[in-house]
A protein has these predicted regions:
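Bacterial N-terminal signal peptides that target proteins for export
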Residues: 1-9
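Short Gly/Thr/Asp-enriched flexible loops that form oxyanion-binding sites at enzyme active sites
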Residues: 115-137, 279-288
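Internal gly/pro-rich beta-alpha loop/helix module
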Residues: 142-213
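C-terminal non-catalytic interaction/assembly regions of soluble proteins
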Residues: 276-356
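Short, acidic/small-residue loops that bind anionic groups at enzyme active sites
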Residues: 126-157, 163-167, 292-301
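ATP/NTP phosphate-donor binding region
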Residues: 25-103, 285
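Bacterial N-terminal signal peptides
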Residues: 8-18
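Accessory alpha-helical/coil subdomains and C-terminal extensions
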Residues: 29, 35, 59, 63-70, ...
Length: 356
């Protein structure tokens, strides 16, 4: 009996030590929080080859279950912020997301954030977070072009790589990142370029920040624009962002679109201009009238790459316009909304476009 009792005690001690060792090993892993917002990565279709699907149909727990080995990279917790297709992403959700990220990253035990997001408006949310997050810890957005039920779905590996980037110390201080199909992009430069191809995101002006392969990363570029902790924008007490409209320029553009935007309460207007941010004479005159009424007019371009220069084809000084520099229309809108949270001159807003 005594021998059996001693054996029992030894086994109990060994089991306890094993549990402590396992717990210690678990604690050594970085702590990552995945914030889910919906999108194709959480989408589901009736069959594996069906193009039509329902966005945001899969929960964060189900997504994690579909990624073997992901929990070997980090201790992962998941939260559902929203569950929408990104065409339905709202400014309210963006504000909620940014505030939650700031709250989580203020906790010493949280090492990084991964946000699952639809690709349609991912670049807008990424750029917003790049200006609103107040931490150098990694924040990584990830999505997919194929739903979770598709043959050769791209979401699981994208999510694995995103967590791999989030746990990498070399990701810190680079601003908000986007990981899609082995590529690591900075929030300032990336844009969606294809409606269907899985390699849809490109960074045409500044190039990739790095590459990721099965959780292994190679960084070779650092974002050159002001972001996160160096950003002057504070959304901690912001509940609503000013209305800013985007108007698309085209041959024989109807100038009354600009007048209608002003009449409906826009505080700012971004023109997705032709070429170097240009528009026809009637629209230029309407935009000048809007600027005279205190509406901030930003000239961007509908062209995928290139910069919009100040006083190049349009006399911005005379018309009191802002040139978007490198920002495409959708990102110019994000920056302008944040700029309008407090009174600024047109010159001050122009400097923001040279900074962010």
């Amino acid at each position: 009996m005594k021998a059996n009792h001693r054996i029992f005690l030894v086994l109990t001690i060994l089991i306890a030590l094993g549990c402590e060792h396992s717990a210690a090993q678990e604690k050594k892993l970085p702590n990552i929080v995945i914030l889910a917002t919906g999108g194709t990565i959480a989408g589901a279709a009736a069959t594996g080859t069906q193009a039509a699907y329902t966005s945001g149909a899969v929960t964060i727990d189900a997504m994690l279950a579909a990624v073997p080995g992901i929990k070997d990279l980090a201790n992962i917790k998941g939260e559902q912020i929203s569950n929408v297709g990104s065409q339905d992403m709202t400014l309210d959700i963006m504000l909620t997301l940014a505030k939650r990220i700031n709250g989580l990253l203020a906790q010493p035990e949280v090492d990084g954030i991964v946000v699952t997001h639809g690709t349609d408006t991912m670049e807008e949310t990424a750029f917003f977070l790049n200006l609103a997050v107040k931490s150098e810890k990694p924040v990584v957005l990830v999505g997919s072009m194929r739903p979770s039920t598709a043959v050769s779905a791209d979401g699981p590996l994208n999510l694995f790589d995103a967590v791999g980037v989030a746990v990498d110390p070399n990701s810190a201080g680079r601003g908000v990142l986007v990981v899609m199909n082995d590529w690591i992009h900075g929030a300032h430069s990336l844009t969606k370029t294809s409606t269907t191809a899985i390699q849809t995101f490109m960074s045409p002006l500044r190039g990739l920040v790095g590459v990721s392969s099965y959780g292994k990363n190679d960084f070779y570029n650092r974002p050159q624009w002001t972001h996160t902790t160096a950003s002057e924008f504070d959304i901690s007490n912001v509940t609503r962002l000013p209305r800013v409209d985007i108007l698309y320029a085209y041959a024989d553009m109807a100038a009354d679109l600009i007048d209608a935007s002003v009449a409906n309460g826009a505080h700012g207007i971004v023109i997705a201009g032709v070429g170097n941010g240009n528009m026809n004479k009637a629209s230029l005159e309407a935009a000048a009238r809007a600027a005279q009424k205190g509406v901030v007019v930003v000239r961007s371009s509908r062209v995928v790459t290139g910069t919009v220069g100040r006083n190049v084809e349009v006399n911005d000084d005379q018309m009191n316009f802002v040139a978007s520099d490198e920002l495409n229309p959708q990102k110019a809108r994000i920056l302008l909304m944040l700029a309008l949270l407090k009174p600024r001159t047109t010159g001050e807003i122009q400097n923001l476009f040279y900074t962010y």
